[in-house]
């Protein structure tokens, strides 16, 4: 989960979560710009939107559902010029971004 849908640093406590965490909004923008990482994230996010009749909990399980929401919140902020990640939040979380991720991002501005 961590290397497909990474979260902002400071949320997860496991070694894998810490290893794959994104340090800042600037790093999230760089992640999106990377030819492999950005493309993979977009492809996987799009695939979740193609699942019919399932909730995020059905797809990922309870813990990873929270990680997915957190990741989509981070990349919604980082990709202000595209709506893919917001569509995931809209579809699976009734438009409600992850408050813990938003708190970590508070005060960070996009460089793009």
Regions found by a protein language model. Give the residues of each.
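Hydrophobic/aromatic-rich, well-ordered segments within soluble, folded domains that form packed cores
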Residues: 1-25
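Short acidic/histidine-centered micro-motifs embedded in hydrophobic/aromatic stretches
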Residues: 7, 44, 91
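Serine-centered coil/turn micro-motif
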Residues: 14, 34, 82-83
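Mid-chain, well-packed structural core segment of small domains
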Residues: 30-79
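Charged phosphate-binding loop/patch that engages nucleotide di/tri-phosphates or the phosphate backbone
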Residues: 78-112
């Amino acid at each position: 989960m961590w290397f497909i849908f990474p979260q902002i640093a400071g949320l997860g406590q496991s070694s894998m979560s810490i290893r794959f965490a994104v340090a800042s909004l600037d790093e999230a923008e760089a992640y999106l710009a990377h030819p492999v990482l950005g493309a993979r994230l977009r492809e996987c996010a799009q695939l979740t939107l193609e699942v019919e009749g399932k909730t995020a909990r059905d797809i990922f399980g309870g813990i990873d559902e929270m990680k997915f929401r957190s990741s989509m919140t981070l990349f919604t902020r980082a990709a202000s010029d595209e709506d893919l990640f917001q569509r995931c939040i809209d579809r699976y979380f009734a438009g409600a971004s992850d408050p813990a991720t938003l708190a970590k991002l508070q005060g960070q501005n996009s460089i793009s």
